[in-house]
C-alpha cells in the first residue's frame, strides 16, 4: 500500500524572496532491487539488468564519492555497484547535467555491473530530513540507512561496503551493523583492488588535486577573473533580454584572443544583432571553455571590435599583427556559465628544459592540450620528466577566479608522441569515441552463422515476408573492399508494361530487438566510425559483415520499398513497403558498373559471378545486367532532374585516394573522380529516404525521426559572392533554386577549377543537416535545403547508423496491422526522440571530425620524409581562392589540400618574384584590395596575386610537439606549375584505404619477421580495417619511422 508524505522545498525567487513549496511524495513497499538474491522477485518487479551473482560483496558509494570518483567507478573491473537515488540526485543538482548524464549512461550500459536503487521511494529506506540537519548529513544518513535495508533484504547473504569521504560517518556507522562496512574510497581500493594500478593512480591524482584546491581556497590571492553571477540573476537577465545565452566557440587559430557565441540559443530582444558575438581576450571569456553554454553581456558599441582577417599560425603568440581587423561586430563578455562542457583532454607535458625552469622539485605542471582551443591546464605530478615524451589524458577539476589556468588531474597515458597508435588514440579521445569490444552479454544476443551451424531463413519468416529470390534481379553497387553491404537495387518490367524500381535494405531490426543489450550499445555508439585505416563498427561483425550484409548469392532478410513507374515518363504510380527475402545476384564495384554502363563489356572477366557460366548463359545474364544498370541510370537521371528543378544543390567535396608503388611505399595522393554510377545509386537512396520519411510522418506526425537541412544565413555567402564577382559571375543566393542555377552558370571554360572552388565555398556556407523529432518543430521547418525535398530521413544504412534503425522500426509500425503491439516496443516519445536525436547528431559530428583528422594523417604521412627542396612531388600547382591581409588561401587540386601561404614572413619581409618568376623574401609592404593583393619591395619591385590565379607551391611539413604536425604551403613562383615528364600522373587505378592498410601492414610484418619478432595472428575479420581486440599490429610501426603517421590539420587562421 502506498504511503503519502510531504516534501517541503524552499526556493528563492528572482526578487530574492523565499518561496515555500509543498509536494506530495509517495512511498512504496517494494521497489526494484535488481539483485539476484532478492527473496521476492515478483514483488520487486525487476526490469532491466540485475547485479552479477559472481561478486563477493556489493559496494554503495555515498553522494560525495559519486561526485568525485565517478571516473573510477566507471572501471569495468569494479562490479556490484549500487547507486542510491539520493546520490544520483546530489550529482544532478551539484555537478550539472553533463555529469548526471554520464552517470545515467553508466547505469544504462550493459557492460557495467551497476544498478540504481530508488531508496527515496521505498517505505523502509526513506528518512525525512531532521530540523537543523545539513543536506550533506541527511544524504549520508539516508544512503547508510538504505544500505542496511538492502543487506537485510538480501537475507544477510551479501556483505555491503559503503564508501564515503565523511570521517564522522565512518566513526558513527563503521561498526553499527554487522555485514555493512563503512570505509573511505581509498581504503576500499587498497583492500579490495590492490592490483588495479590504473584506479590507484587515478585516485591519487584526484586526491592530490582536491587537496590543492582546498589549500588554494584557504590562501589569499588576487582575482584574475570576475566572479560569475548567481544563477537566478543570469536567468532573469536572459528573460529580460539584458543577457544572451549561447555556446562558446573558440577560434583555434587565435585561441587566446578570439571566441564567438552563436546567437541561435539567444533570447535577446535586441533586433540589431545579425551576427555572432565576439568575445575578445581571455579576461572577457572569464574561465569559460570551448563548448560551454555561457551567458554574455553585450559591451557598449564604442567598445565593439572586429575579427582579425590576417593569417596566423596556431603556435604564434596570438598578439595583434598590426593588420587592420574587419568591421566592428557585436562584442561582449561572459558573465556566467550555465553548463560546462568539460571532457577528457589529450595533453603534452613540457620539455625537460621547461620543467627544470619551473624548479627542480616542482609538482605543479602546466600541460598543453592537443586541441588549440583549450587553455593550458595545471596538474600536480612528480612524473613530469617521465611523461614528457607521451600523450596523456587529463580532466579539469576546477577553475577558480584567482587562477590564471584551470586545475586538473592526470588520468592515463595514451602513447608516445608521434607513434601511430598514440596519434590514433588521441583522435578518438578528442572526439569522445569509445572503442571497447562488444561485451559477452551483447554477443550472446547475436545469431550464429558458422560452418557447423549455418544460418538459414526460418519457415516462419518465409511465410510472413514477400519472397523476391526468384522473381527479381537484385544486385549491389559499392566501393571496392566494402563488406557491410546494406543496400541493393532491382528494376524490372511488369506485365502491364510499367517498370518496377526496388530499393532493398538490410533488415537489421529483425536481429536487434528494442532495448536489448546490443540495441543499447548501438544507440550509444550511434554510428560506425570510419578512420582512414580502420573502422569501429556500430554492430558486431556477425551482423555488419555477415547476416545483415546483402552479399551476393546468399539469402538475406530485407526491408524493401518498391515503386511502380510509368514506362515512359517514370512517374510514380504506386508504392509498396514491406519485409522481404532477397538473394543478391551480383556484388558490383562502382568502377565495374560504370564500365558496363559505358559499354565496355570486357570488364565482365572481373565480375566473379560470371566466371563459371557457359557462354550462352553468360551472354544472357550480361545483357540482363547491362539493361538493369542502364535503366536504373535513366530513372536516376529523371529523378535528379525533378530535384534540380526544385533547387537541389550539387556541391563540391574532395575525397583523396592513396596509391602505393611496387615496394609498398605510399606513392601518390589522388582525388577520387566522380562516376555517374555514384549518382545513380545516390538518387535511388535519396528517393527511398524521401518516401519513407513521408510514410512515417503520415503515421506518426509527432514522433517520427526526420532529417532537416535549414537554409544558410545569407551573410555566410558573402565570400562566395565576392569571389564569383571577381570572375564576372553573379551568384543569386535567395533560394536553393537560384543558388543551384547560379553555380551551374559559373563556369570558366579555360579553368574548370573555378567552378569547383565556388561549389566548395557554397558547401562551407551551408548549415549542418540534423536529425529531429517531428513533434519538436513546425512542419515548414522539415524542409531539406540541399536536396530540395519537403521531408527526408535516413533509412538506407541501418548497419552503420542508429537513426536508420529507429526509422526502420517506425516504418514497420506504420505498415503493421497490429499497430498497438508494434508501437509499444518500437517508438520513442517526442521528448525521448528529441534527446536521442541530439545524441546522434553529436556522435555524427564526432565521426566526421575523426574521419577528417585521420585522413589528414595520411596526407601528412605522404609528405613527412620527402625533402621539399629536392623532391619533385613536393612541388605542385595551387589556385588562390581567398585573399587575406598578409597572405592567400590556396587549393592544391592534385592532392585535394587546402591551406594558407604567407606573403609576409615573421621577419617582416615580403615575397618578391623576379623576371624568372621565382620568389624570394625582401623588405617591403603588402597592399590588399578586394580581389587581389600586391607585394611591393623597397627597391620598387612588385608582384600582384589575383583570385583564382594559378601559382607554383612547395609543400612541406611543420612539426609540432604538443599538437599535430601540419602541412605548410609556400609560393615559389607566381606562374602555374608545369608538370615535368618525370612527374606524370600515373594512370593506374588508385588503391582504397583498406587496401593501403593491408599493404602497409604486410610490409611491417615482413620487416618484423626478418628481425625474428613473433607476431600474434589476428582474426581474419579484423584484418580488413585493423579493428583489433587487443594490441594491434600497428604498434609495430614504431620500428619503421618512415611510416610513422602524424595528424594533419589546417594550422592557419582561415
UniProtKB/Swiss-Prot annotation:
Q: What is the lineage of its organism?
A: Eukaryota, Metazoa, Chordata, Craniata, Vertebrata
Q: Does the keyword Cell membrane apply?
A: no
Q: How does it assemble?
A: Component of the RNA exosome complex. The catalytically inactive RNA exosome core (Exo-9) complex is believed to associate with catalytic subunits EXOSC10, and DIS3 or DIS3L in cytoplasmic- and nuclear-specific RNA exosome complex forms.
For this record, an example GO cellular component is: ciliary basal body
Q: PROSITE patterns, from UniProt?
A: RIBONUCLEASE_II
The superkingdom of the source organism is Eukaryota
- Return the Pfam families for the record: OB_Dis3 (PF17849), RNB (PF00773), Rrp44_CSD1 (PF17216), Rrp44_S1 (PF17215)
**Residues bearing PTM Phosphoserine:** 989
Task: Say which enzyme class the record assigns.
Answer: hydrolase
| Primary location recorded for the protein, binned into one broad class | cytoplasm
Functional description taken from the UniProt entry: Catalytic component of the RNA exosome complex which has 3'->5' exoribonuclease activity and participates in a multitude of cellular RNA processing and degradation events. In the cytoplasm, the RNA exosome complex is involved in general mRNA turnover and specifically degrades inherently unstable mRNAs containing AU-rich elements (AREs) within their 3' untranslated regions, and in RNA surveillance pathways, preventing translation of aberrant mRNAs. It seems to be involved in degradation of histone mRNA.
The record's annotation in SUPFAM superfamilies points to: Nucleic acid-binding proteins
Q: Which cysteines are joined by disulfide bonds?
A: none
Report the EC number(s), separated by commas if there are several.
3.1.13.1
Q: Give start and end of each RNB domain.
A: 465-816
Keyword RNA-binding listed? The answer is yes
Instruction: Name the catalysed reactions.
Output: Exonucleolytic cleavage in the 3'- to 5'-direction to yield nucleoside 5'-phosphates
Task: Report what the protein is called.
Answer: DIS3-like exonuclease 1
* GO terms, biological process: mRNA catabolic process; RNA catabolic process; RNA processing; rRNA catabolic process
